A protein has these predicted regions:
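Structural beta-strand segments of beta-rich domains
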Residues: 26-30, 117-121, 208-212
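Flexible, low-complexity linkers/stalks enriched in Thr/Pro that connect modular domains
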Residues: 1-11, 91-102, 182-193
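Extracellular beta-sheet repeat scaffolds used for adhesion and glycan interaction
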Residues: 39-83, 89, 130-174, 180, ...
């Protein structure tokens, strides 16, 4: 009498390595285990599929066929052994495909020129992510994260000079890197103008609108203090001659000038 072995035990399958989420890879890998070899069937409403049709006894890695951006929360796998026993239904852990890079744009440029060595800068991003600073001008910031919307950063201390190649990029959680945003060029000038008297008012003088000459290390706006004033409001680099407004006969010992660059 012939004896026929019967296999009525279905394979048991389990997730081993889920799809990275989020991921910018639209053909991601997935690994599962099976205690029997067999044929893989793909299902679920999320329409995941693969060209891998056979499962090993042990671990099987599959590469999913090209997926569009979106959330995949109902991809399933079953394994059918040689005796047509069908395994449990394995639902892949939900994952997100995101192949779209953030878009960043300048909102508020650094004031130019500025005497602030740690100036503010505002830009927008349509995704949250991690900021990377670059460019040959060596601008950096302790602000490392960006929100979806406008983000204000404080640039780390800068020396006086021109900054015309500071860049920002944003990398989202799926590792998509944004366009490179180059900050509008700006100048940091934290050094005040230096003034020196060149030609004092003749003393005494019978001129009620006497001239006065001073030098400035920078262009700027003149501010008068004390009892003296003038219609000249701008200073140039080097020597400047001003005519004081009409003065009464008297002694003038409190006349001051400052220049704001």
């Amino acid at each position: 009498t012939a004896t026929t072995d019967s296999d009525t035990t279905a394979p048991v399958i389990a997730e081993f390595t889920a799809v990275t989420t989020p991921t910018s890879d639209f053909t991601p890998n997935y690994t599962f285990s099976s205690n029997e070899a067999g044929t893989i069937t793909y299902g679920g409403s999320s329409s995941c599929n693969s060209n891998t049709s056979s499962a090993f006894n042990g671990f099987t890695s599959i590469t999913l066929i090209s997926l569009r951006d979106g959330t995949y929360d109902n991809c399933t796998i079953t394994v059918t052994d040689n005796s047509s026993n069908v395994s449990n239904i394995l639902t892949l852990t939900s994952f997100l495909i995101d192949t779209t890079a953030p878009t960043v744009a300048e909102v508020t440029a650094v004031t130019d020129p500025t005497n602030d060595s740690t100036p503010n800068y505002t830009f927008s991003s349509n995704e949250a992510g991690t900021i990377t600073y670059g460019g040959s001008s060596s601008c950096t910031s302790d602000n490392s994260s960006v929100i979806s919307g406008n983000s204000l950063i404080v640039i780390n201390s800068l020396r006086d000079g021109s900054y015309d190649n500071c860049t920002v990029t944003v990398t989202d959680s799926a590792e998509n890197v944004s366009n490179t945003l180059t900050l509008t060029s700006f100048n940091v000038d934290s050094t005040a103008a230096r003034l020196v008297e060149v030609t004092s008012v003749t003393n005494p003088t019978n001129d009620s609108t006497p001239d006065y000459t001073f030098s400035s290390s920078e262009d700027g706006t003149i501010t008068y203090g004390g009892s003296c004033s003038s219609n000249t409001t701008s200073a140039t680099t080097d020597n400047n001659t001003i005519s004081l407004n009409s003065l009464s006969d008297d002694t003038y010992s409190d006349c001051t000038i400052t220049v704001t660059d």
